Amino acid sequence: MMIYSITPPHRLRGIIDLPGDKSISHRAILLNAVAAGSAEITNFLTGADCLSTIACVQALGVHIERQGTTVRVDGAGLRGLREPVDVLDCGNSGTTLRLLAGMIAGQEGMFAVLTGDSSLRSRPQQRIVAPLRALGASLDGRQQGNCAPLAVRGAHLHGGAYELPIASAQVKSALLLAALFGDAPLTLTGRTDGRDHTERMLAAMGVEITVNTPVIRLTPPAHSDALRPLSLRAPGDPSSAAFWWVAAAIHPDAELTTTGVCLNPTRTGALDALRAMGAQIEVTNQRIEGSEPVGDVTVRSSQLRGITIEGALIPRLIDELPVLALAAACAEGETIIRDAQELRVKETDRIATAASGLTALGATVEPTSDGMVISGGARLRGASLDSHGDHRLAMTWAIAGLVASGETTLRGAGAVDVSYPEFWGVLARVAER
Protein backbone atom coordinates (compact mmCIF):
# COMPACT_ATOMS: atom_id res chain seq x y z
CA MET A 1 0.00 0.00 0.00
CA MET A 2 1.38 3.40 -1.01
CA ILE A 3 2.01 5.76 1.92
CA TYR A 4 2.67 9.46 1.32
CA SER A 5 3.74 12.15 3.79
CA ILE A 6 2.89 15.83 3.35
CA THR A 7 4.09 18.92 5.20
CA PRO A 8 3.00 22.53 4.56
CA PRO A 9 5.04 24.34 1.89
CA HIS A 10 6.01 28.01 2.15
CA ARG A 11 3.86 28.82 -0.86
CA LEU A 12 1.92 27.35 -3.78
CA ARG A 13 2.59 28.59 -7.29
CA GLY A 14 2.04 27.14 -10.71
CA ILE A 15 0.12 26.67 -13.93
CA ILE A 16 -1.53 23.26 -14.08
CA ASP A 17 -2.56 21.49 -17.27
CA LEU A 18 -5.35 19.22 -16.14
CA PRO A 19 -6.00 15.63 -17.14
CA GLY A 20 -8.96 15.08 -19.43
CA ASP A 21 -12.41 15.09 -17.91
CA LYS A 22 -13.31 11.67 -16.55
CA SER A 23 -17.00 11.80 -17.48
CA ILE A 24 -16.30 12.93 -21.03
CA SER A 25 -13.48 10.41 -21.52
CA HIS A 26 -15.80 7.54 -20.55
CA ARG A 27 -18.58 8.72 -22.83
CA ALA A 28 -16.29 9.40 -25.78
CA ILE A 29 -15.23 5.74 -25.77
CA LEU A 30 -18.71 4.30 -25.23
CA LEU A 31 -20.55 6.44 -27.77
CA ASN A 32 -17.88 6.16 -30.45
CA ALA A 33 -17.91 2.39 -29.95
CA VAL A 34 -21.37 2.28 -31.55
CA ALA A 35 -20.71 5.00 -34.14
CA ALA A 36 -20.19 4.28 -37.82
CA GLY A 37 -16.56 5.22 -38.41
CA SER A 38 -13.39 6.19 -36.59
CA ALA A 39 -12.84 8.91 -34.02
CA GLU A 40 -9.79 10.31 -32.26
CA ILE A 41 -9.93 11.44 -28.65
CA THR A 42 -7.08 13.58 -27.33
CA ASN A 43 -6.27 14.53 -23.74
CA PHE A 44 -8.03 11.30 -22.77
CA LEU A 45 -7.91 10.57 -19.06
CA THR A 46 -5.64 7.58 -18.52
CA GLY A 47 -6.88 6.91 -15.00
CA ALA A 48 -7.83 3.39 -13.99
CA ASP A 49 -11.58 3.97 -14.38
CA CYS A 50 -11.38 5.12 -17.99
CA LEU A 51 -8.94 2.33 -18.84
CA SER A 52 -11.57 -0.09 -17.51
CA THR A 53 -14.01 1.35 -20.03
CA ILE A 54 -11.52 0.82 -22.87
CA ALA A 55 -10.88 -2.78 -21.81
CA CYS A 56 -14.59 -3.60 -21.60
CA VAL A 57 -15.37 -2.04 -24.97
CA GLN A 58 -12.47 -3.93 -26.56
CA ALA A 59 -13.95 -7.12 -25.11
CA LEU A 60 -17.12 -6.27 -27.05
CA GLY A 61 -15.15 -6.44 -30.30
CA VAL A 62 -14.41 -2.75 -30.83
CA HIS A 63 -10.93 -1.92 -32.12
CA ILE A 64 -9.25 0.72 -29.95
CA GLU A 65 -5.67 1.98 -30.08
CA ARG A 66 -4.13 4.19 -27.38
CA GLN A 67 -0.86 6.08 -27.44
CA GLY A 68 -0.50 8.04 -24.23
CA THR A 69 -3.50 10.34 -23.94
CA THR A 70 -4.57 9.91 -27.58
CA VAL A 71 -7.13 7.20 -28.34
CA ARG A 72 -8.52 6.03 -31.67
CA VAL A 73 -11.86 4.21 -31.67
CA ASP A 74 -13.09 2.33 -34.74
CA GLY A 75 -16.82 2.22 -34.15
CA ALA A 76 -18.77 -0.97 -34.76
CA GLY A 77 -22.13 0.68 -35.38
CA LEU A 78 -25.22 0.36 -33.24
CA ARG A 79 -25.65 -3.34 -33.96
CA GLY A 80 -22.02 -4.35 -34.42
CA LEU A 81 -20.92 -5.19 -30.89
CA ARG A 82 -19.75 -8.75 -30.26
CA GLU A 83 -20.83 -10.91 -27.34
CA PRO A 84 -17.96 -11.04 -24.83
CA VAL A 85 -16.34 -14.41 -24.14
CA ASP A 86 -15.62 -13.57 -20.51
CA VAL A 87 -16.93 -11.46 -17.66
CA LEU A 88 -16.55 -7.69 -18.18
CA ASP A 89 -14.47 -6.32 -15.31
CA CYS A 90 -15.35 -2.67 -14.66
CA GLY A 91 -12.79 -2.31 -11.87
CA ASN A 92 -13.82 0.51 -9.55
CA SER A 93 -15.83 2.35 -12.20
CA GLY A 94 -19.53 2.82 -11.61
CA THR A 95 -19.77 4.81 -14.83
CA THR A 96 -18.39 1.89 -16.83
CA LEU A 97 -20.77 -0.63 -15.31
CA ARG A 98 -23.93 1.46 -15.44
CA LEU A 99 -23.50 2.90 -18.93
CA LEU A 100 -22.40 -0.43 -20.39
CA ALA A 101 -25.46 -2.08 -18.84
CA GLY A 102 -27.65 0.38 -20.73
CA MET A 103 -25.80 -0.18 -23.99
CA ILE A 104 -25.74 -3.98 -23.78
CA ALA A 105 -29.40 -4.14 -22.72
CA GLY A 106 -30.41 -3.21 -26.27
CA GLN A 107 -28.11 -5.68 -28.06
CA GLU A 108 -30.68 -8.37 -28.84
CA GLY A 109 -29.37 -11.89 -28.27
CA MET A 110 -26.22 -10.78 -26.44
CA PHE A 111 -25.34 -12.05 -22.96
CA ALA A 112 -22.82 -10.33 -20.71
CA VAL A 113 -21.87 -10.27 -17.05
CA LEU A 114 -20.63 -7.00 -15.55
CA THR A 115 -18.65 -6.98 -12.33
CA GLY A 116 -15.98 -4.95 -10.55
CA ASP A 117 -13.89 -4.68 -7.42
CA SER A 118 -15.26 -5.11 -3.91
CA SER A 119 -16.21 -1.44 -3.66
CA LEU A 120 -18.17 -1.46 -6.93
CA ARG A 121 -19.86 -4.74 -6.05
CA SER A 122 -21.25 -3.11 -2.91
CA ARG A 123 -22.73 -0.06 -4.65
CA PRO A 124 -26.48 0.08 -5.46
CA GLN A 125 -27.46 -0.86 -9.01
CA GLN A 126 -31.24 -1.08 -8.64
CA ARG A 127 -31.26 2.57 -9.70
CA ILE A 128 -30.41 1.43 -13.25
CA VAL A 129 -31.87 -2.07 -13.15
CA ALA A 130 -35.43 -0.95 -12.39
CA PRO A 131 -35.75 1.70 -15.14
CA LEU A 132 -33.99 -0.48 -17.72
CA ARG A 133 -36.38 -3.32 -16.92
CA ALA A 134 -39.23 -0.86 -17.46
CA LEU A 135 -37.96 -0.44 -21.04
CA GLY A 136 -37.98 -4.21 -21.56
CA ALA A 137 -34.40 -5.00 -20.57
CA SER A 138 -33.39 -8.28 -18.95
CA LEU A 139 -31.00 -7.72 -16.04
CA ASP A 140 -30.37 -9.55 -12.81
CA GLY A 141 -27.80 -9.59 -10.07
CA ARG A 142 -27.17 -10.17 -6.41
CA GLN A 143 -29.71 -8.93 -3.89
CA GLN A 144 -32.57 -8.95 -6.42
CA GLY A 145 -30.52 -7.04 -8.95
CA ASN A 146 -29.23 -4.39 -6.58
CA CYS A 147 -25.57 -5.41 -6.63
CA ALA A 148 -23.02 -6.59 -9.18
CA PRO A 149 -22.18 -8.94 -10.72
CA LEU A 150 -25.00 -8.01 -13.09
CA ALA A 151 -26.12 -10.41 -15.80
CA VAL A 152 -27.47 -8.58 -18.85
CA ARG A 153 -29.28 -10.33 -21.68
CA GLY A 154 -29.88 -8.10 -24.67
CA ALA A 155 -33.55 -7.70 -25.50
CA HIS A 156 -36.00 -5.81 -27.69
CA LEU A 157 -36.40 -2.47 -25.92
CA HIS A 158 -39.39 -0.17 -25.97
CA GLY A 159 -39.74 3.57 -25.76
CA GLY A 160 -42.05 5.37 -23.43
CA ALA A 161 -41.63 7.71 -20.49
CA TYR A 162 -39.70 7.46 -17.26
CA GLU A 163 -39.49 9.84 -14.31
CA LEU A 164 -36.04 9.92 -12.75
CA PRO A 165 -36.31 9.91 -8.94
CA ILE A 166 -32.69 10.98 -8.32
CA ALA A 167 -30.33 13.39 -10.05
CA SER A 168 -27.78 10.89 -11.38
CA ALA A 169 -25.96 11.42 -14.66
CA GLN A 170 -25.06 7.73 -14.69
CA VAL A 171 -28.69 6.63 -14.46
CA LYS A 172 -29.79 9.19 -17.03
CA SER A 173 -27.00 8.19 -19.40
CA ALA A 174 -27.69 4.46 -19.03
CA LEU A 175 -31.28 5.08 -20.11
CA LEU A 176 -30.29 7.31 -23.02
CA LEU A 177 -27.83 4.71 -24.28
CA ALA A 178 -30.49 2.02 -24.02
CA ALA A 179 -32.93 4.29 -25.85
CA LEU A 180 -30.67 4.27 -28.91
CA PHE A 181 -31.86 0.68 -29.45
CA GLY A 182 -35.54 1.18 -28.60
CA ASP A 183 -38.49 0.82 -30.95
CA ALA A 184 -39.95 4.23 -30.05
CA PRO A 185 -38.86 7.54 -28.51
CA LEU A 186 -37.96 7.75 -24.82
CA THR A 187 -39.00 10.72 -22.70
CA LEU A 188 -37.25 11.38 -19.39
CA THR A 189 -38.68 13.71 -16.75
CA GLY A 190 -38.08 14.32 -13.05
CA ARG A 191 -34.51 14.76 -11.80
CA THR A 192 -32.83 15.18 -15.16
CA ASP A 193 -30.51 17.84 -13.75
CA GLY A 194 -26.86 16.93 -13.36
CA ARG A 195 -24.13 16.44 -15.91
CA ASP A 196 -25.35 16.69 -19.49
CA HIS A 197 -22.29 15.47 -21.42
CA THR A 198 -24.19 12.49 -22.84
CA GLU A 199 -26.92 14.72 -24.23
CA ARG A 200 -24.40 17.13 -25.79
CA MET A 201 -22.39 14.34 -27.39
CA LEU A 202 -25.40 12.47 -28.74
CA ALA A 203 -26.65 15.67 -30.39
CA ALA A 204 -23.21 16.27 -31.93
CA MET A 205 -23.27 12.71 -33.30
CA GLY A 206 -26.54 13.30 -35.12
CA VAL A 207 -29.02 11.75 -32.70
CA GLU A 208 -32.43 13.40 -32.50
CA ILE A 209 -32.48 14.50 -28.87
CA THR A 210 -34.26 17.51 -27.41
CA VAL A 211 -33.71 18.98 -23.97
CA ASN A 212 -36.35 21.26 -22.49
CA THR A 213 -35.47 21.01 -18.81
CA PRO A 214 -36.64 18.91 -17.10
CA VAL A 215 -37.86 17.00 -20.17
CA ILE A 216 -35.44 15.05 -22.36
CA ARG A 217 -36.70 13.22 -25.44
CA LEU A 218 -34.59 10.87 -27.58
CA THR A 219 -35.75 9.33 -30.84
CA PRO A 220 -33.86 6.13 -31.76
CA PRO A 221 -31.80 6.35 -34.96
CA ALA A 222 -33.46 4.72 -37.95
CA HIS A 223 -30.33 2.88 -39.10
CA SER A 224 -27.51 1.05 -37.35
CA ASP A 225 -24.91 3.29 -39.01
CA ALA A 226 -26.68 6.53 -38.12
CA LEU A 227 -24.29 7.70 -35.38
CA ARG A 228 -21.52 9.92 -36.70
CA PRO A 229 -18.12 9.41 -35.05
CA LEU A 230 -17.14 12.29 -32.79
CA SER A 231 -13.49 13.29 -32.50
CA LEU A 232 -12.77 15.60 -29.59
CA ARG A 233 -10.27 16.88 -27.08
CA ALA A 234 -11.40 16.10 -23.56
CA PRO A 235 -11.38 19.36 -21.58
CA GLY A 236 -9.73 19.54 -18.17
CA ASP A 237 -11.65 17.82 -15.41
CA PRO A 238 -13.23 20.34 -13.00
CA SER A 239 -13.55 17.65 -10.34
CA SER A 240 -9.76 17.28 -10.40
CA ALA A 241 -9.24 21.04 -10.67
CA ALA A 242 -11.27 21.57 -7.50
CA PHE A 243 -8.44 20.18 -5.37
CA TRP A 244 -6.10 22.90 -6.63
CA TRP A 245 -8.78 25.57 -6.25
CA VAL A 246 -9.28 24.67 -2.60
CA ALA A 247 -5.53 24.35 -2.02
CA ALA A 248 -4.97 27.89 -3.30
CA ALA A 249 -7.92 29.32 -1.38
CA ILE A 250 -6.92 27.89 2.02
CA HIS A 251 -3.12 28.25 1.85
CA PRO A 252 -1.83 31.62 3.13
CA ASP A 253 0.51 32.23 0.17
CA ALA A 254 -0.88 30.71 -3.00
CA GLU A 255 -1.76 31.38 -6.61
CA LEU A 256 -2.63 28.46 -8.86
CA THR A 257 -3.99 28.49 -12.41
CA THR A 258 -5.75 25.49 -13.93
CA THR A 259 -5.93 25.64 -17.71
CA GLY A 260 -8.53 24.36 -20.16
CA VAL A 261 -11.09 23.51 -17.48
CA CYS A 262 -14.52 22.26 -18.54
CA LEU A 263 -16.93 25.06 -17.59
CA ASN A 264 -20.12 23.20 -18.46
CA PRO A 265 -22.76 24.78 -16.16
CA THR A 266 -23.66 21.34 -14.80
CA ARG A 267 -20.06 21.01 -13.54
CA THR A 268 -19.26 24.43 -12.06
CA GLY A 269 -20.94 23.98 -8.69
CA ALA A 270 -17.61 23.91 -6.84
CA LEU A 271 -16.63 27.25 -8.37
CA ASP A 272 -19.98 28.72 -7.36
CA ALA A 273 -19.63 27.40 -3.82
CA LEU A 274 -16.09 28.73 -3.44
CA ARG A 275 -17.15 32.13 -4.77
CA ALA A 276 -19.97 32.20 -2.21
CA MET A 277 -17.37 31.40 0.46
CA GLY A 278 -15.35 34.44 -0.59
CA ALA A 279 -12.61 32.80 -2.65
CA GLN A 280 -10.59 35.01 -5.00
CA ILE A 281 -11.32 33.43 -8.37
CA GLU A 282 -10.56 34.70 -11.88
CA VAL A 283 -11.81 32.94 -15.01
CA THR A 284 -10.09 33.87 -18.29
CA ASN A 285 -9.69 32.67 -21.87
CA GLN A 286 -13.25 31.37 -22.03
CA ARG A 287 -14.08 29.55 -25.25
CA ILE A 288 -15.98 26.62 -26.76
CA GLU A 289 -14.09 23.43 -27.59
CA GLY A 290 -16.19 20.79 -29.29
CA SER A 291 -19.54 20.86 -27.53
CA GLU A 292 -18.22 22.11 -24.18
CA PRO A 293 -17.34 25.55 -22.75
CA VAL A 294 -13.82 25.74 -21.31
CA GLY A 295 -11.57 28.33 -19.70
CA ASP A 296 -8.64 28.96 -17.38
CA VAL A 297 -9.29 29.37 -13.64
CA THR A 298 -6.92 31.15 -11.25
CA VAL A 299 -7.46 31.01 -7.49
CA ARG A 300 -5.50 32.96 -4.89
CA SER A 301 -5.21 32.83 -1.10
CA SER A 302 -8.54 33.85 0.39
CA GLN A 303 -10.40 34.46 3.63
CA LEU A 304 -13.26 31.99 3.42
CA ARG A 305 -16.58 32.08 5.26
CA GLY A 306 -19.09 29.35 5.97
CA ILE A 307 -22.12 28.84 3.72
CA THR A 308 -24.98 26.40 3.20
CA ILE A 309 -24.60 23.93 0.32
CA GLU A 310 -27.90 22.29 -0.59
CA GLY A 311 -30.64 21.64 -3.11
CA ALA A 312 -30.03 22.10 -6.82
CA LEU A 313 -26.35 22.89 -6.21
CA ILE A 314 -25.60 19.38 -4.93
CA PRO A 315 -25.65 17.47 -8.28
CA ARG A 316 -23.31 20.12 -9.72
CA LEU A 317 -20.59 19.45 -7.12
CA ILE A 318 -21.30 16.00 -5.69
CA ASP A 319 -17.79 14.70 -6.40
CA GLU A 320 -16.15 17.83 -5.02
CA LEU A 321 -17.94 17.80 -1.66
CA PRO A 322 -15.12 16.10 0.30
CA VAL A 323 -12.60 18.79 -0.61
CA LEU A 324 -15.22 21.53 -0.16
CA ALA A 325 -15.76 20.16 3.34
CA LEU A 326 -12.04 20.71 3.91
CA ALA A 327 -12.42 24.29 2.68
CA ALA A 328 -15.30 24.72 5.12
CA ALA A 329 -13.12 23.50 8.00
CA CYS A 330 -10.65 26.29 7.14
CA ALA A 331 -13.36 28.96 6.79
CA GLU A 332 -14.77 31.25 9.45
CA GLY A 333 -18.21 30.31 10.67
CA GLU A 334 -20.46 27.33 10.10
CA THR A 335 -20.98 25.43 6.86
CA ILE A 336 -23.99 23.18 6.39
CA ILE A 337 -24.04 20.51 3.69
CA ARG A 338 -27.41 18.87 3.15
CA ASP A 339 -29.34 16.94 0.45
CA ALA A 340 -26.13 15.01 -0.27
CA GLN A 341 -27.21 11.52 0.76
CA GLU A 342 -25.75 10.28 -2.53
CA LEU A 343 -22.35 10.57 -0.83
CA ARG A 344 -23.27 7.53 1.24
CA VAL A 345 -23.07 5.24 -1.82
CA LYS A 346 -19.93 6.46 -3.54
CA GLU A 347 -16.61 4.57 -3.52
CA THR A 348 -16.86 4.90 0.26
CA ASP A 349 -19.49 6.39 2.53
CA ARG A 350 -18.01 9.81 1.94
CA ILE A 351 -20.06 11.46 4.68
CA ALA A 352 -18.64 9.10 7.30
CA THR A 353 -15.09 8.95 5.96
CA ALA A 354 -14.79 12.69 5.30
CA ALA A 355 -16.17 13.56 8.73
CA SER A 356 -13.83 11.09 10.41
CA GLY A 357 -10.76 12.40 8.60
CA LEU A 358 -11.57 16.05 9.23
CA THR A 359 -12.11 15.30 12.91
CA ALA A 360 -8.70 13.62 13.06
CA LEU A 361 -7.23 16.82 11.60
CA GLY A 362 -8.76 18.85 14.43
CA ALA A 363 -11.93 20.13 12.75
CA THR A 364 -15.33 20.10 14.42
CA VAL A 365 -17.69 18.10 12.21
CA GLU A 366 -21.13 16.66 12.85
CA PRO A 367 -22.18 14.12 10.21
CA THR A 368 -25.88 13.95 9.36
CA SER A 369 -27.95 11.50 7.34
CA ASP A 370 -27.57 13.61 4.18
CA GLY A 371 -24.48 15.71 4.79
CA MET A 372 -22.60 17.35 7.62
CA VAL A 373 -22.28 20.49 9.73
CA ILE A 374 -18.76 21.90 9.91
CA SER A 375 -17.69 24.52 12.44
CA GLY A 376 -14.85 26.38 10.75
CA GLY A 377 -11.92 28.25 12.15
CA ALA A 378 -10.03 25.41 13.80
CA ARG A 379 -6.27 25.23 13.25
CA LEU A 380 -5.73 21.94 11.50
CA ARG A 381 -2.96 19.66 12.72
CA GLY A 382 -1.22 16.84 10.91
CA ALA A 383 -2.68 13.38 11.32
CA SER A 384 -2.42 9.82 10.07
CA LEU A 385 -5.21 9.37 7.51
CA ASP A 386 -6.46 6.65 5.18
CA SER A 387 -7.95 7.00 1.71
CA HIS A 388 -9.99 3.80 2.17
CA GLY A 389 -9.25 3.24 -1.51
CA ASP A 390 -11.22 6.37 -2.48
CA HIS A 391 -9.44 8.66 -4.94
CA ARG A 392 -11.36 11.78 -3.90
CA LEU A 393 -10.49 11.24 -0.25
CA ALA A 394 -6.83 10.60 -1.04
CA MET A 395 -6.53 13.95 -2.80
CA THR A 396 -8.58 15.76 -0.15
CA TRP A 397 -6.22 14.58 2.60
CA ALA A 398 -3.21 15.54 0.48
CA ILE A 399 -4.56 19.09 0.19
CA ALA A 400 -5.23 19.12 3.94
CA GLY A 401 -1.57 18.28 4.49
CA LEU A 402 -0.60 21.52 2.73
CA VAL A 403 -2.13 23.60 5.55
CA ALA A 404 -2.17 21.31 8.61
CA SER A 405 0.67 21.91 11.06
CA GLY A 406 3.28 19.18 11.25
CA GLU A 407 3.20 16.08 9.09
CA THR A 408 0.17 14.42 7.52
CA THR A 409 0.59 10.77 6.58
CA LEU A 410 -1.73 9.20 4.03
CA ARG A 411 -2.23 5.47 3.62
CA GLY A 412 -3.62 4.30 0.30
CA ALA A 413 -2.18 7.25 -1.59
CA GLY A 414 -2.17 5.22 -4.81
CA ALA A 415 -5.95 5.57 -5.02
CA VAL A 416 -5.40 8.81 -6.97
CA ASP A 417 -4.63 6.65 -10.02
CA VAL A 418 -8.37 6.13 -10.49
CA SER A 419 -8.88 9.68 -11.78
CA TYR A 420 -5.61 11.65 -11.56
CA PRO A 421 -2.43 9.56 -11.99
CA GLU A 422 -0.26 12.69 -12.25
CA PHE A 423 -1.56 14.20 -9.00
CA TRP A 424 1.48 13.58 -6.81
CA GLY A 425 3.86 14.90 -9.44
CA VAL A 426 1.87 18.11 -9.83
CA LEU A 427 1.70 18.53 -6.06
CA ALA A 428 5.48 18.26 -5.78
CA ARG A 429 5.92 20.86 -8.53
CA VAL A 430 3.57 23.55 -7.17
CA ALA A 431 4.54 23.19 -3.50
CA GLU A 432 7.55 25.49 -3.06
CA ARG A 433 9.64 24.66 -0.01
Swiss-Prot record:
Pathway it works in: Metabolic intermediate biosynthesis; chorismate biosynthesis; chorismate from D-erythrose 4-phosphate and phosphoenolpyruvate: step 6/7
CDD domains: EPSP_synthase (cd01556)
Gene Ontology CC: one annotated term: cytoplasm
Residues annotated as the enzyme's active site: D319 (proton acceptor)
Major enzyme class: transferase
UniProt cross-references to NCBIfam families, sorted A to Z: aroA
Reported function: Catalyzes the transfer of the enolpyruvyl moiety of phosphoenolpyruvate (PEP) to the 5-hydroxyl of shikimate-3-phosphate (S3P) to produce enolpyruvyl shikimate-3-phosphate and inorganic phosphate.
Subunit text: Monomer.
PANTHER family the record matches: AROM/DEHYDROQUINATE SYNTHASE, PENTAFUNCTIONAL AROM POLYPEPTIDE
Protein name (Swiss-Prot/TrEMBL): 3-phosphoshikimate 1-carboxyvinyltransferase
Protein source organism: Roseiflexus sp. (strain RS-1)
Lineage: Bacteria, Bacillati, Chloroflexota, Chloroflexia, Chloroflexales
Gene: aroA
